[in-house]
Amino acid sequence: MSITVEEKARLIKEYATKEGDTGSPEVQVAVLSSRIATLTEHFKAHKKDNHSRRGLLMMVAQRRKLLDYLKKKDEGRYTALIARLGLRR
């Protein structure tokens, strides 16, 4: 249901803007997107799991806030990230 330590480390390494970067919006959005995809698969089998669905909605909202922040600060980085992750908008 959650992502593994190795998967998270791979995402951090792939989306980091510099060495040791774990807090940039790009990294945070990539990790959230991976967790959202995992939970989406979970809901295909467990349709009535409303407790976890609330967590999913909170993650989607957090990702949206981070993307809005990135768009406001640097639209070029925003469009590049959207393209790399394959997100709509």
From Swiss-Prot:
InterPro entries: Ribosomal_uS15, Ribosomal_uS15_bac-type, uS15_NS1_RNA-bd_sf. Signal peptide: none annotated. Transmembrane segments: none annotated. GO terms for biological process: translation. One of its GO terms (molecular function) is rRNA binding. GO terms for cellular component: cytosolic small ribosomal subunit. Keywords: Ribonucleoprotein, Ribosomal protein, RNA-binding, rRNA-binding. Belongs to the universal ribosomal protein uS15 family. This is Small ribosomal subunit protein uS15. It comes from Cereibacter sphaeroides (strain ATCC 17023 / DSM 158 / JCM 6121 / CCUG 31486 / LMG 2827 / NBRC 12203 / NCIMB 8253 / ATH 2.4.1.) (Rhodobacter sphaeroides). The lineage of its organism: Bacteria, Pseudomonadati, Pseudomonadota, Alphaproteobacteria, Rhodobacterales. The gene is rpsO.
